[in-house]
Amino acid sequence: MSTQGLVTLLGNAQCHLRTSTNYNGVHTQFNAALNYKNKGTNTIDGSEAWCSSIVDTNQYIVAGCEVPRTFMCVALQGRGDHDQWVTSYKIRYSLDNVTWSEYRNGAAITGVTDRNTVVNHFFDTPIRARSIAIHPLTWNNHISLRCEFYTQPVQSSVTQVGADIYTGDNCALNTGSGKREVVVPVKFQFEFATLPKVALNFDQIDCTDATNQTRIGVQPRNITTKGFDCVFYTWNENKVYSLRADYIATALE
């Protein structure tokens, strides 16, 4: 399995980190990002990992997000400047930050065996949560770790609406017989990042037919991120003086 296409929470500063304890002010969660290294010229940058001040199974580091995320994978790494690492751990998570669940009912997940090798664990099924926590169970010398959480990209719905797409008076649908259409180009107010879905509805119909069967339609064609063609059409003996429609366009970005 691969992390390609997934979002790194710590690497992109998309979460808040909190820990049970910190060894001191330069051994905190701020040093917990995967592959973090200090400058090596002084002690200001601190340890190359988060290090707990208490060494027991009650320690944790938790990542909290503003909105729920779909977690796919967790990566673990040891402390880069000392022989300290977590050899096994469990995962807990919460959707509301009140009720917490244990991944695999709290079963141990294999950790790392050295300072710098990154070990990924892909979840059996994606975890939907706002917060997720690593709870070390066993360790080498001290509880110290660097980590990363991988999630699916967050998509939000972007919608634009438009009105008064008009065929014009006495349009081409008002003459002839059989299948006829009028195409009206429509430009969005702003360009979408991805291809939208477009829905149309009539807000004015001015037509007649000798058989009292009104046959008209409207549909989008040639949809792009910048606009589309609005196609008004009729068939048989219908005479359509004019049609007008509105649209709603929605995309996930």
Curated annotation (Swiss-Prot):
<protein>
    <recommendedName>
        <fullName>Discoidin-1 subunit D</fullName>
    </recommendedName>
</protein>
<keyword id="KW-0007">Acetylation</keyword>
<dbReference type="Pfam" id="PF00754">
    <property type="entry name" value="F5_F8_type_C"/>
</dbReference>
<dbReference type="InterPro" id="IPR019019">
    <property type="entry name" value="H-type_lectin_domain"/>
</dbReference>
<comment type="subunit">
    <text>Tetramer of four different chains (A to D).</text>
</comment>
<dbReference type="GO" id="GO:0098609">
    <property type="term" value="P:cell-cell adhesion"/>
</dbReference>
<dbReference type="GO" id="GO:0098636">
    <property type="term" value="C:protein complex involved in cell adhesion"/>
</dbReference>
<dbReference type="GO" id="GO:0070492">
    <property type="term" value="F:oligosaccharide binding"/>
</dbReference>
<feature type="domain" description="F5/8 type C">
    <location>
        <begin position="2"/>
        <end position="152"/>
    </location>
</feature>
<dbReference type="InterPro" id="IPR052487">
    <property type="entry name" value="Galactose-binding_lectin"/>
</dbReference>
<dbReference type="GO" id="GO:0030246">
    <property type="term" value="F:carbohydrate binding"/>
</dbReference>
<feature type="short sequence motif" description="Cell attachment site">
    <location>
        <begin position="79"/>
        <end position="81"/>
    </location>
</feature>
<dbReference type="GO" id="GO:0005737">
    <property type="term" value="C:cytoplasm"/>
</dbReference>
<dbReference type="GO" id="GO:0007155">
    <property type="term" value="P:cell adhesion"/>
</dbReference>
<keyword id="KW-0430">Lectin</keyword>
<dbReference type="GO" id="GO:0007010">
    <property type="term" value="P:cytoskeleton organization"/>
</dbReference>
<dbReference type="InterPro" id="IPR000421">
    <property type="entry name" value="FA58C"/>
</dbReference>
<dbReference type="GO" id="GO:0030247">
    <property type="term" value="F:polysaccharide binding"/>
</dbReference>
<dbReference type="InterPro" id="IPR008979">
    <property type="entry name" value="Galactose-bd-like_sf"/>
</dbReference>
<dbReference type="Pfam" id="PF09458">
    <property type="entry name" value="H_lectin"/>
</dbReference>
<comment type="function">
    <text>Galactose- and N-acetylgalactosamine-binding lectin. May play a role in cell-substratum adhesion rather than in cell-cell adhesion. May be necessary for the maintenance of normal elongate morphology during aggregation.</text>
</comment>
<feature type="modified residue" description="N-acetylserine">
    <location>
        <position position="2"/>
    </location>
</feature>
<dbReference type="GO" id="GO:0009986">
    <property type="term" value="C:cell surface"/>
</dbReference>
<dbReference type="GO" id="GO:0031012">
    <property type="term" value="C:extracellular matrix"/>
</dbReference>
<dbReference type="InterPro" id="IPR037221">
    <property type="entry name" value="H-type_lectin_dom_sf"/>
</dbReference>
<keyword id="KW-0963">Cytoplasm</keyword>
<dbReference type="GO" id="GO:0046871">
    <property type="term" value="F:N-acetylgalactosamine binding"/>
</dbReference>
<keyword id="KW-0130">Cell adhesion</keyword>
